[in-house]
Amino acid sequence: MSSKVTRKIYFCGSIRGGREDAALYKRIIDQLQSYGEVLTEHVGDLEAQEEELGETCDDYYIHERDINWLFSSDAVVAEVTQPSLGVGYELGRALEHKKNVLCLYRPQPGKRLSAMIKGAENGKNFFVKEYKEEDVPDLLMNFFTSL
């Protein structure tokens, strides 16, 4: 009898930087669940309590918990439209540990994606894709089938 190993996916999205896109995060996370276990599904939980989002936890605890999840993941998917220092930090650590990363960015008038994210794209394990929400299924399929 063989056991199936489930892919672990770390999803990044703004929490303290703004929750305007939480509903979108939830829809992306719902799609990601068909590719594996999403370790950070609380990021898209519209009804998450402060404790679940880490608002009432010690900052050290949140950092250690999330970094452990990040390092144990097989792939990282980040929605980077809403600027977030935390997401940028997570992506830097993911790149440092040679994780497979897909960044999703919705172009908006008068706003540009940080060069530190866009410039990290290497065509090997770090990808940045401009998208509309209807593009997400194909972008995820292409990313995960290439791993």
UniProtKB/Swiss-Prot annotation:
GO terms for biological process: deoxyribonucleoside monophosphate catabolic process; nucleoside metabolic process; nucleotide metabolic process; positive regulation of cell growth. It comes from the Eukaryota. It is an enzyme of class 3 (hydrolase). Catalyzes the cleavage of the N-glycosidic bond of deoxyribonucleoside 5'-monophosphates to yield deoxyribose 5-phosphate and a purine or pyrimidine base. GO terms for molecular function: 5-hydroxymethyl-dUMP N-hydrolase activity. One of its GO terms (cellular component) is nucleus. It catalyses: a pyrimidine 2'-deoxyribonucleoside 5'-phosphate + H2O = a pyrimidine nucleobase + 2-deoxy-D-ribose 5-phosphate; a purine 2'-deoxyribonucleoside 5'-phosphate + H2O = a purine nucleobase + 2-deoxy-D-ribose 5-phosphate. It is found in: Cytoplasm; Nucleus. Substrate binds at Y10, F11, C12, G13, S14, I15, R16, Y25, H42, E90, S114, A115, M116. Belongs to the 2'-deoxynucleoside 5'-phosphate N-hydrolase 1 family. Monomer and homodimer. InterPro entries: 2'-dNMP_N-hydrolase, DNPH1, Nucleoside_deoxyribTrfase. Its EC number is 3.2.2.-. This is Putative 2'-deoxynucleoside 5'-phosphate N-hydrolase 1. Keywords: Cytoplasm, Glycosidase, Hydrolase, Nucleotide metabolism, Nucleus. Its main location: cytoplasm.
